[in-house]
Amino acid sequence: MPHFLAKLDSKPLEYPLIRGDFCFHREFLSLKHPTKSCVHASFKNDVFLLQKIRRAGDFLIKSEKATPLKREILKQALRIYSQSFEVISHNLQENSKHASQKKALDLETFEDFIQKNQAPILIEIGFGSGRHLIELAKNNPTTTCLGIEIHTPSIAQALKQIELLDLKNLHILQGDGRLVLESMPNHRCEKIFVHFPVPWNEKKHRRVLSEKFLNEALRVLKPRGFLELRTDDSLCFEDSLKLALKNFQCEIEIKKNAQIPVVSKYEARWNKLKKDIYDLKIYSLGLDENPTQNHALDFSFDTITIDKESVGAILKTPKIIKEGYFVHVCNIYENKGDFLVELSMGDFDWPVRLFVLLAENQVFYLNKSPLKTLNNHKAHLLLQNILSQKELDERDHRSE
């Protein structure tokens, strides 16, 4: 991670510090850990935070992961900020020109990606080695393709192939495919592929394909678009088939041991062992003219008045756990009566770290809002109650 170390006796800074397109607005001091602070900064329209940690013999100054920037811009920001200190050491050298420039999307940048790509897209969830995904993109050069994966080595391997093959229509997102679909607008997918997911026969609630997932898939698929499940696990196939048969929004197509043009490494292994492979293709009929979607969920805050006394009570709030979501106030930072609240919150499947700024009678998420899912919205409403102290007044701190 880009950072630098500075001497403790470095001169105090005067804010705001403006250098070109960079502005370091002010420094918020932690009310929980006196050795920590956050520097509120911006580059053009991008807002970010720097962490400043006082140690035994130096300051450590680095990026705050909850407010990400492109790596080279972040390094430039730290290089500029370091000019106001007596630097002991750093790792802020410019990257090699030969370094890979292709990066994975994340859940925080996904909404921007969807807004820029209005045409229906092809999605593969859990692409593993990436063989099927790469061929999908090669065979559909004018269609935007998206691979969703949580396994970092698989993502790195796919990104390398994308760069080598110059596949400009293929993008990779690191995240939970269930949450990605839930946050998407209606009728934005042409096809969704789920090939050889972990069957989770002993923990079925962890499966990708559930009743909720199927409903979301049918919502985001355009009419006659399809979700394709390919699996070697008969129980997983049978349970998925039962889910599809109960849903009146779709029609299904079943195949067994079908030959397909692209065979994954996993499938090739089972073919050698003569193991059965099942295909379940679920077509969206598009019967629901106004399907419910989460894309319009409101993550703004009502007006909140806060002072040091109420901040102390909020900071002492224990983690509040509800069914499927939670809110944890991790820390609060202060600067002349304005407050920066550090949070861990949201859906249990993919919790996020966020910062909320309370300044000049305004309350808003700094840098990014939570992904627009139902559980994240419930967590947002709970946070609204915590900050306005409604949840504190009700004494609802018990874990459910």
From Swiss-Prot:
It comes from the Bacteria. GO terms for molecular function: tRNA (guanine(46)-N7)-methyltransferase activity. Pathway: tRNA modification; N(7)-methylguanine-tRNA biosynthesis. The keyword Methyltransferase applies. S-adenosyl-L-methionine binds at E124, E149, D176. GO terms for cellular component: tRNA methyltransferase complex. Keywords: Methyltransferase, S-adenosyl-L-methionine, Transferase, tRNA processing. Its EC number is 2.1.1.33. Substrate binds at D232. It is an enzyme of class 2 (transferase). It catalyses: guanosine(46) in tRNA + S-adenosyl-L-methionine = N(7)-methylguanosine(46) in tRNA + S-adenosyl-L-homocysteine. CDD domains: AdoMet_MTases. Gene3D superfamilies: Vaccinia Virus protein VP39. Pfam families: Methyltransf_4 (PF02390). NCBIfam families: PRK14121.1, tRNA (guanosine(46)-N7)-methyltransferase TrmB. Catalyzes the formation of N(7)-methylguanine at position 46 (m7G46) in tRNA. Belongs to the class I-like SAM-binding methyltransferase superfamily. TrmB family. This is tRNA (guanine-N(7)-)-methyltransferase.
